[in-house]
Swiss-Prot record:
It is an enzyme of class 2 (transferase). One of its GO terms (cellular component) is cytoplasm. Residues 105-342 form the Radical SAM core domain. It is found in: Cytoplasm. GO terms for biological process: rRNA base methylation; tRNA methylation. [4Fe-4S] cluster binds at residues 119, 123, 126. Its cofactor is [4Fe-4S] cluster. Belongs to the radical SAM superfamily. RlmN family. One of its GO terms (molecular function) is metal ion binding. InterPro entries: Aldolase_TIM, Methyltransferase_A, RlmN_N, RNA_MTrfase_RlmN, rRNA_lsu_MTrfase_RlmN/Cfr, rSAM. Specifically methylates position 2 of adenine 2503 in 23S rRNA and position 2 of adenine 37 in tRNAs. S-adenosyl-L-methionine binds at residues 171-172, 204, 227-229, 304. This is Probable dual-specificity RNA methyltransferase RlmN. It comes from Chlorobium luteolum (strain DSM 273 / BCRC 81028 / 2530).
Length: 361
């Protein structure tokens, strides 16, 4: 029986080797083929002129090459001194949609990418969580988001390039770890046409502890950010029910201590300040206790409004008071500005227009 053809861009390097072995080709060809796909971005097997004609034919019998398509572009200048924040809605070959965001900053250009279509974890402040889980993205689909943003940037200015990548878009990266790591390799170590330093890539998680432990052992130089949002177990469970119950704060702290000591890198603890929920002096003191004793820094972030979700951001005074309490205790604290709120491109707002957020445009 003839096997159905599949999209070769969905395969990781290890899977590509297996696929070549299955058609009686040596595995070492995988690197060559991978380079055609992910550096030259060949649109057809006929373009792969360094591969023999019989091999190209065999590949075309088993696979096709289909890249994601940009369906919609939005941009806003609001609150962004370094240029417009831009959001792309990307349609994947099977019709699923994800969003990806380009955020200009002083001396940097950051791509914020999605790792999953939807999300299983349903955090109460997050639009993606309202969508439910659709599926994991392949490494090619993650890599393709950076290409799409990079192409958009370079069409306007050949000299411009993406310097930083953050896995802070839709979905939980560490529930799709193998494909996220493969995408990191595509975008850094392999030195392909698009390449940045691993140190400029941040993987952001709600705290999937076994995967944090695994990441610490990979030798990757990527940075780790953890969405903490409360250092009090009950409050965290109210905000992020699934993640907080499955990976309690004590266990999470063990993983973070292990990660920081193995990698020698600080962990960033992201703390979204929510009015009347986690913004009191007592909350700050619990955070100090939690964050003391291991190599970390704290990013205070604002809540960005989401349709059907009733949290409120704190005022400037509350944010500054909270920061001062942490700083007085010796913690390294940054107030991180959010960009892209008017186009629902800021933290927690990405939902591939499934929540009706597009009505606000
Ligand atoms: S915050 Fe992250 S983990 Fe939580 S629902 Fe949103 S995408 Fe999922």
């Amino acid at each position: 029986m003839k096997r159905e053809r599949s999209n070769i861009l969905n395969l990781r390097m290890d899977e590509l080797k297996e696929a070549l072995a299955a058609i009686n080709e040596p595995q070492w060809r995988a690197a060559q083929l991978h380079q055609w796909l992910f550096s030259h971005r060949a649109g057809s097997f006929d373009d792969m002129t360094t591969l023999s004609l019989p091999l190209r034919r065999k590949l075309a019998e088993s696979f096709y090459i289909q890249q994601p398509v940009t369906e919609k572009h939005d941009e806003t200048m609001e609150g962004s001194p370094a240029g417009a924040t831009e959001k792309l809605l990307i349609q994947l070959p099977d019709g699923e949609r994800v969003e990806t965001v380009l955020i200009p900053g002083p001396n940097r250009m950051t791509a914020c990418v999605s790792a999953q279509a939807g999300c299983l974890l349903g955090c109460s402040f997050c639009a993606t969580g309202q969508m439910g889980f659709r599926r994991n993205l392949s490494s090619g689909e993650i890599t393709g988001q950076v290409w799409a943003l990079s192409d958009m940037l370079q069409e306007r200015n050949r000299e411009a390039s993406i310097s930083n990548i953050v896995f802070m878009g839709m979905g939980e990266p560490l529930l799709n770890t193998a494909n996220v790591i493969e995408a990191v390799l595509n975008l850094s170590t392999r030195k392909y046409r698009f390449s940045t330093s691993q140190r400029k890539i941040t993987i952001s998680t709600v705290g999937i502890t076994p995967e944090i432990d695994r990441l610490a052992d990979t030798g990757l130089k990527t940075k780790l950010a953890v969405s903490l949002h409360s250092a009090i177990q009950e409050k965290r469970e109210a905000l992020m029910p699934q993640a907080a119950r499955q990976y309690p704060l004590d266990r999470l702290r063990e993983s973070l201590i292990g990660y920081a000591s193995k990698t020698g890198e600080p962990v960033t603890l992201a703390y979204m300040l929510l009015k009347g929920i986690n913004d009191s002096e007592m909350d700050a003191k619990r955070l100090i206790r939690y964050a003391s004793g291991f190599f970390c820094k704290i990013n205070l972030i604002d809540y960005n409004p989401i349709v059907n979700i009733k949290f409120e951001p704190v005022c400037d005074g509350t944010r500054e008071r909270f920061r001062d309490i942490l700083q007085d205790a010796g913690l390294q604290v940054t107030i991180r500005k959010s960009y892209g709120t008017p186009i629902n491109a800021a933290c927690g707002q990405l939902a591939a227009d499934c929540t009706g957020n597009s009505d606000n445009l």
